[in-house]
Amino acid sequence: MITKQKVNAYELTGLKEPKKVIFPRIASLLFYGLAIYVVLIITNVLISSFYGFNLTTNYISELGSKKVIPFPYFHDLICAFGGLISLPTNFFVRKKLRVQYKNSKHSILFLELGAVSGVVGNVGYIFLGVFSLDRAGPGQIYHGIITLISFGGFVISIFFFSLNIVLSHKCKLKNLGAFGLVIPILLVFLYCMITIPLIEWFLLSSIAFFMLFLDYYIFKV
């Protein structure tokens, strides 16, 4: 009787009964892997500051240039690690949001677009470690294209995941969804108008902030 009433309660609220993550160890690995990536980025910036690196005058990609710091391969490895560890997260997010909230034609489309864009962003970020400034190609064209693919994929992915969150009924992540809809896109526009390193760092920080909080909710670590 109790079980039956519980099922009916979920049906009445338009929610589906939450399901536990199938692979809890993998879930923890993905979340803590992303957290480690953030720590590695911060550590790299702090160490690089002893060689004159500054967030207000140096772009993110300059961490991967031997003209700026003596250990550019560290940044290349961080990019590859960050892209690899966060790539599977897109599928967990799509699964969790689809299971947790009532499906509609539009929500499924948003989730699919978010997952695909996220994968594109992750693959692009992995290749940022390959086509760093030291291997940027003629006129830095390879690095420029990969950067556009990477950050573009992340921003579009966050937008569609956030759109699904905001439009879902009784979602606990409304504030995070509003953040994802506004802040990354606003920073992209600001960067296009005022191309300064600090805005690029804010953009990377907003992407990492959104993904960390979303991962925490998805994986319940």
Language-model regions: role of each:
Residues 45-59:
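Membrane-helix interface motif
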Residues 63-84:
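Interfacial helix-start motif at the membrane-water boundary
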Residues 91-117:
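Cytoplasmic juxtamembrane regions at transmembrane-helix boundaries
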Residues 157-221:
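Terminal transmembrane helical module of multi-pass membrane proteins
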Residues 1-22:
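Short, Lys/Arg-rich, polar N-terminal cytosolic tail immediately upstream
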Residues 21-48:
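N-terminal signal-anchor transmembrane alpha helix
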Residues 118-161:
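Membrane-proximal helix-loop-helix units in multi-pass membrane proteins
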